Amino acid sequence: TTRDSIYVDFKYKQRELVLIDTAGIRRRKNIDLDIEKFSIVKALQAVELSDSVIVLIDGMEGITDQDLSLIGLVLKNERALTIAVNKLDALTEYQMENIDKQIRRKLKFVNFVDVNNVSALTKENITLVLKSAIDAADVSLKTVPTSKITKLIEDMVESDPPPYNQGRRIKLKYAHQAGSQPPMFIIYG
């Protein structure tokens, strides 16, 4: 079995894309350590080369520690993230709901990420996952004008004023975008 990454060039809705399919990272009891180390290095390289990463979770197993580690790596490398849960064709609605709850519970820190249920076997929702990954990349690269950010801050302060600090209300003056992928903002007070 090859453990190398496969690069596939294709066009989707007038966009040139490269899909990097990496070998799955498996549980320790099921692995040949040398081959697995090679696979992990290739997966890390693929994350570094990517604008957007789709983490494919096996719906029969649920989210594993390896999945959580990979998601952490994607976020640490500041890449857009989409999660796909495979085996939609083999799971009952009840099982899918339980997996969704498990994912939302274990990934509270990434509640902004799209989670899509798919079937690699029947190809169900595959284009939905691709669209989610492209949208996530587009959003992560977006820049917002300072005036819009400042207006948003003003509206937020008006509807829900900041707390007092040492008897004085915290004042938020303006904000600007400090970077993208991921978008970062600096608020001045």
Where are these regions (language model features)?
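C-terminal-of-GTPase-core extension/linker across diverse P-loop GTPases
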Residues: 1-20, 28-41, 45, 49-56, ...
